């Protein structure tokens, strides 16, 4: 299938009620919060634990999005739940399928408070032996990474734990990854096991600027009695919010990735301006102190290859020196051009020389194969269609290194 053959599937859905009529969702609540919500609606105390267990199983194991499908819950209880709560998925505005099997969903969440509805994109990348979902944590981004398509776009708001988890639930719906579900005909996905085996917090926004919601969502995603993803298959990527890095390992316990991209402070100040606040020494010191760090649980360092900017042999030498003493994997990302950028991708021969040098020093240094370019789903290219039309409000998100993250076992 050629680039022009990429499929676009429009998914119009009924409008959600206005914010004033919006029911609270049970998705994204901790067990304690779910118990409190049921208690407030008059569920007898002696039933609370059992009802929470039922709901948890139906929402996260069976994947239902309608209370009427909860067949072991009494009808009067289902009616109460329907009256006061929701477990609905976000609206799918558009679904695109790349010729390499990559899927991109444009999702719309309802207005909250005095705000307006917001849109984000989630991306699924099937690979041999795994399927990786890239999830967003914010609408927009406060970071101004100069090589990224989203670098000048403002933050609208944080996503809630519900909205973060809903991206995973919706993807599993669409891919037939819940019990008794079938995948769309012709879907490219792993031959065995889960369709969504890995998730990466690398979509729109900086996850560590929305720490509490991200923490709650990931703890639910890795809960052994629910979605049950292995923490070794969940990767959180940060541009370097140093104060929250230790907390990420201590309180969430997932794999860590760092958007590095430069080995000198003067250059990283330009490419990743958060470096002005948290320079390289502080960042690397925080990485060395990451809880659970070992050769079996290495930190991944992302490094976008920019021609004549950061791709010299001296840069490769500096990278090895910088990461000395850090159990690390270095992912080299060929730059994905976007309209108006002044950067170019490094020549392939130079990328291979860079990778060989890093590898000879003992670091795994895979070169990431670009995916989903025909639907603008590749690294740094993601941007919702509705926001392309609203040029003065350009909202988008960074999708750093979606594939090749987390453990395979």
From Swiss-Prot:
Cleavable signal peptide: none
Enzyme Commission number(s) of this protein: 2.1.1.192
Any one GO molecular-function label of the UniProt entry: 4 iron, 4 sulfur cluster binding
Binding sites annotated in the UniProt record for S-adenosyl-L-methionine: 205-206, 237, 259-261, 336
Active site residues per record: 121, 379
Cystine connections: 134-379
Domain Radical SAM core, first and last residues per copy: 127-376
Function in brief: Specifically methylates position 2 of adenine 2503 in 23S rRNA and position 2 of adenine 37 in tRNAs. m2A2503 modification seems to play a crucial role in the proofreading step occurring at the peptidyl transferase center and thus would serve to optimize ribosomal fidelity.
UniProt protein name: Dual-specificity RNA methyltransferase RlmN
Organism annotation: Rhizobium etli (strain ATCC 51251 / DSM 11541 / JCM 21823 / NBRC 15573 / CFN 42)
């Amino acid at each position: 299938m050629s680039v022009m053959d990429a499929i676009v599937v429009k998914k119009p859905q009924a409008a959600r009620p206005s914010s004033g009529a919006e029911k609270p969702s049970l998705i994204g609540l901790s067990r304690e919060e779910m118990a409190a919500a049921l208690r407030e609606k008059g569920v007898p105390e002696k039933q609370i634990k059992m009802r929470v267990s039922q709901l948890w199983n139906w929402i996260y194991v069976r994947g239902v999005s309608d209370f009427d499908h909860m067949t072991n819950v009494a009808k009067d209880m289902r009616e109460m739940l329907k009256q006061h709560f929701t477990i609905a998925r976000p609206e799918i505005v558009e679904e695109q399928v790349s010729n390499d099997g990559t899927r991109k969903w444009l999702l719309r969440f309802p207005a909250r408070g005095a705000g307006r509805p917001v849109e984000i994109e989630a991306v699924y990348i099937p690979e041999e032996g795994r399927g990786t979902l890239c999830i967003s944590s914010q609408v927009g981004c406060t970071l101004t990474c100069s090589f990224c398509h989203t670098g000048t776009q403002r933050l609208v708001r944080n996503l809630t734990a519900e909205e973060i988890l809903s991206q995973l639930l919706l993807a599993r719906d669409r891919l037939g990854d819940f019990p008794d579900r079938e995948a769309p005909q012709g879907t490219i996905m792993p031959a065995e096991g889960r369709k969504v085996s890995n998730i990466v917090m690398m979509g729109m926004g900086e996850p560590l600027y929305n720490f509490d919601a991200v923490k709650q969502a990931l703890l639910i995603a890795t809960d052994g009695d629910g979605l049950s993803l292995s923490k070794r298959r969940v990767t959180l990527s940060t541009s370097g919010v140093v104060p929250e890095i230790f907390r990420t390992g201590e309180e969430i316990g997932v794999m860590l990735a760092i958007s590095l991209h430069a080995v000198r402070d003067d250059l990283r100040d330009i490419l990743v301006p958060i470096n002005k606040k948290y320079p390289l020494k502080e960042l690397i010191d925080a990485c060395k102190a990451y809880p659970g760090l070992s050769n079996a649980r290495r930190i991944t360092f992302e490094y976008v290859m920019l021609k004549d900017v950061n791709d010299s042999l001296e840069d490769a030498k500096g990278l090895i020196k910088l990461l000395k003493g850090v159990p690390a994997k270095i992912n080299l990302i060929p730059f994905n051009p976007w309209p108006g950028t002044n950067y170019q991708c490094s020549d392939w021969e130079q990328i291979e020389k860079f990778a060989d040098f890093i590898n000879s020093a003992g670091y795994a240094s895979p070169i990431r194969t670009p995916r989903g370019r025909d639907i603008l789903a590749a690294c740094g290219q993601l941007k919702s269609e509705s926001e392309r039309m609203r040029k003065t409000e350009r909202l988008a998100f960074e999708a750093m290194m979606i594939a090749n993250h987390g453990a395979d076992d």
